[in-house]
A protein has these predicted regions:
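Cytochrome P450
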Residues: 1-384
Length: 384
């Protein structure tokens, strides 16, 4: 279920509609769209109100109907599509794989992937599209490694993941998507017999008897595709922010110890997931002076909430707290991996390419709108 939000996001510029909305308060009613059964819809843009709603899973449901077979197969990997107790059970199986200890064990391999992919990016020659030659390969390979995909399979699977989301040919998107589904099903079956390393192995060893084969394969596919797609969007936007803010890029190159704050500022400022799954009120409740009744639909704008805390991109920001990964029980379980990718990749990019810059005027860049897929730049031509 996708709710069209009442604005058009154009690149990285502020969204003027949100400035106007904030002046009128944190909660707003907007017109019912076709397919919503006449239910009233609400848009929430206030930080405190968004936190309140996202934390209140007892009175707001995030479950949604799924009719498409392909989406149904993917569903176990989309934790925010579930309410407790199913959400609790599925998240408990996945969360240990994202522990701080496992992230640190993964760091050397991520560093290797980043350097190898930047070698490939550089070898193409200036100018080159950063999205195709770095922003997609890096997270796709990281996601494969994280899941426990054998090294010999990673390059081909990474290509299929990218083509399933990025190819301009519908036939190729479909065939690549089916290739990913078939591979993850075989991978899940293999991990049942021999868990080995990676997220799926961790799940099988610790919770394998709690999951059906379909759920295990769905967790594999969902974490693989969503991790790759969202981290690709985030990495490309991060580099775009740096090359369009050269003083900030120079500061990060001179002071790499600022990378943790830089990563958080990128995540806050870009807000590639504009809104989490819409919530449906389960009871009558009052939010910021508005009565929201049972059955009405509430969309929480993470973009509006995060940008309200500062429109300027500043990697030294001290108040970079944000809700880009959500809040409450549906806080993004993959946030540690997304942060680690940026903390490794950004210093490497600015160190290796100190003169990196756009190869086209910024106004010529094209963006994906961010609903339902993450907000992303389609191509990012760079030169040095």
């Amino acid at each position: 279920m996708v709710l069209p939000l009442p604005h058009q996001r154009l690149g990285l510029d502020p969204v003027p509609e949100y400035d106007d909305l904030r002046k009128d308060g944190p909660v707003h009613e907007y017109d019912t769209e076709p397919g919503m059964d006449g239910r009233k819809q609400w848009l929430v843009t206030g930080y405190d109100e968004v936190r309140e709603i996202l934390a209140d899973h007892a009175r707001f449901s995030s479950m949604r109907p799924v009719d498409d077979e392909a989406d149904r197969a993917l569903l176990p990997g989309i934790l925010q599509a579930y309410d407790p107790p199913d959400h609790t059970r599925l998240r408990r199986t996945v969360a240990p794989a994202y522990s701080a200890r496992r992230m640190e064990r993964l760091r050397p391999r991520i560093e290797e992937i980043v350097e190898d992919c930047l070698d490939g990016f550089e070898s193409v020659g200036s100018p080159v599209d950063f999205v195709r030659h770095a922003a997609w390969p890096i997270p796709a390979l990281i996601a494969c490694e994280f899941l426990g995909v054998p090294r010999d399979d990673q390059a081909e699977l990474s290509r299929m993941i990218r083509d399933s989301r990025e190819s301009r040919l519908a036939r190729q998107r479909t065939s690549s998507g089916l290739g990913v589904v078939n591979y993850t099903q075989r991978l899940a079956a293999r991990k049942r017999r021999d868990p080995g390393e990676g997220m799926i192995g961790v799940i099988v060893r610790e919770h394998g008897d709690e999951l059906t084969d379909e759920e295990l394969a769905g967790l594999a596919e969902g974490n693989l595709i969503m991790a790759a797609e969202q981290m690709a969007a985030q990495l490309a936007i991060a580099v775009l922010l740096l090359v369009t803010h050269p003083a900030q890029m120079a500061l990060l190159r001179e002071r790499p110890e600022l990378v943790d704050g830089a990563a958080e500022e990128v995540i806050r400022h870009a807000s590639i997931v504009e809104a989490p799954a819409p919530r449906v009120a389960l009871a009558v409740l009052r939010v910021a002076g508005h009565d929201i009744r049972a059955g009405e639909v509430v969309t929480c704008s993470l973009l509006a909430t995060n940008r309200a805390r500062g429109e300027r991109f500043d990697i030294t920001r001290q108040n970079a707290g944000h809700l880009a990964f959500g809040h409450g029980i549906h806080h993004c379980v993959g946030a540690p991996l997304a942060r680690l990718q940026l903390r490794v990749a950004l210093p490497a990019v600015v160190r290796r390419f100190p003169a990196l810059r756009l190869a086209v005027p910024e106004e010529d860049l094209r963006f994906k709108p961010g609903r339902p897929a993450p907000f992303a730049v389609e191509e990012l031509p760079l030169e040095w």
